[in-house]
């Protein structure tokens, strides 16, 4: 019994201890565990909701993606159709362009071929015509007949007078031309009784005055000023030149500076002109005018054919003694004393002009002194005496003055004549007519 009571008390103590010290922690642990389980259940429920929402969003995104894909496909299909339509339109346009361009190219090639055929045919025709003409004029009578036909045509021109400018004064204005005529008239008066030697000295003195005007430009400017005080300038010339040149030369210079000139260079030209006249008058006094004219024209033709020689003689920047020495060697014994003096004076007094032009002008001046015009005639062969006479007579009627013929032979002319009088050219050669026909061929 006592054992039972002891055990009961022990059991009660154990129960007390359990209730007092074990049950509260256990209860708290259970409560905490329950809270944890509850929270986990809530979190699980929340997660499940999120998963459900995610599934819904995924499904929605999938639907949207499918819709976008369908839209992209539709847009791509529409763009493809538009691009295909544009490409078809471009292809049609390109085909049309190539077609039109091809037609234009064919037309161009056709026209070009036609032009080439026409040109070739025209060239061949002209070449054949040239051969026929050359064969025809190889006979002297036929070639002479072409000259006669040209003279017949020229004869028809004779009633219409041609205005021929004075070769000497053509480069001047009217005032200077009148002054030059007055100076030449005064020169003729002063040299009426001067002998050949005096004329030679006069030419040298006037050439020296011309060189003085070049080396003393201030003096030349004062003498050439277009003023009314001609007497004052003449007195100045006398003061400067008296005792240094002859009285005749001084009077010529005074007459020159007393005139009114349009330009200062005209006075220089006038003095050089009188220097040439002195030697030409000397040729007249010595009855060698024709010889001098012929020699001048022959030398002029040499310069025309030798451009390098003309260039050397024209180069006034080189020493004049060297150029005159070259001139003397060229002339040798083929020219008279007067011709040599005229050519040397011309070369010495060049002012930038070409030697060939200056010599040609000198030769024409020699002819003009006799009241004639110079006709430079080019022919394929020598003219007969009758043709020369008729040509001179026809030109004399056209220009109102006797004509001096200067004939140049050029076989390439084939036939007919080419005549140059001053600046007027009458071209009646067969070669020029064939050339004209060739230039008129279609391009």
From Swiss-Prot:
Transmembrane regions: 4-24
Which compartment or compartments is the protein found in? Cell membrane
Query: GO CC annotations?
Result: plasma membrane; proton-transporting ATP synthase complex
SUPFAM superfamilies, sorted:
F1F0 ATP synthase subunit B, membrane domain (SSF81573)
Keywords on this record? Answer: ATP synthesis, Cell membrane, CF(0), Hydrogen ion transport, Ion transport, Membrane, Multifunctional enzyme, Transmembrane, Transmembrane helix, Transport
ATP synthase subunit delta as annotated region, ranges: 169-443
Q: Give the chief site where it resides.
A: membrane
Q: Which domain of life is it from?
A: Bacteria
How does this protein lie in the membrane? Single-pass membrane protein
Q: Per its record, what are the GO molecular function terms? A: proton-transporting ATP synthase activity, rotational mechanism
Q: Which Pfam families has this protein been placed in?
A: ATP-synt_B (PF00430), OSCP (PF00213)
Chain spans, region ATP synthase subunit b:
1-168
- Cited function: F(1)F(0) ATP synthase produces ATP from ADP in the presence of a proton or sodium gradient. F-type ATPases consist of two structural domains, F(1) containing the extramembraneous catalytic core and F(0) containing the membrane proton channel, linked together by a central stalk and a peripheral stalk. During catalysis, ATP synthesis in the catalytic domain of F(1) is coupled via a rotary mechanism of the central stalk subunits to proton translocation. This fusion protein includes a component of the F(0) channel (subunit b) and of the F(1) subunit (subunit delta). Two copies of subunit b and one of delta together form the peripheral 'stator' stalk which links F(1) to F(0).
Name the protein family: In the N-terminal section; belongs to the ATPase B chain family. In the C-terminal section; belongs to the ATPase delta chain family.
Q: How does it assemble?
A: F-type ATPases have 2 components, F(1) - the catalytic core - and F(0) - the membrane proton channel. F(1) has five subunits: alpha(3), beta(3), gamma(1), delta(1), epsilon(1). F(0) has three main subunits: a(1), b(2) and c(10-14). The alpha and beta chains form an alternating ring which encloses part of the gamma chain. F(1) is attached to F(0) by a central stalk formed by the gamma and epsilon chains, while a peripheral stalk is formed by the delta and b chains.
Official protein name in the record: ATP synthase subunit b-delta
Organism listed in the record: Mycobacterium sp. (strain KMS)
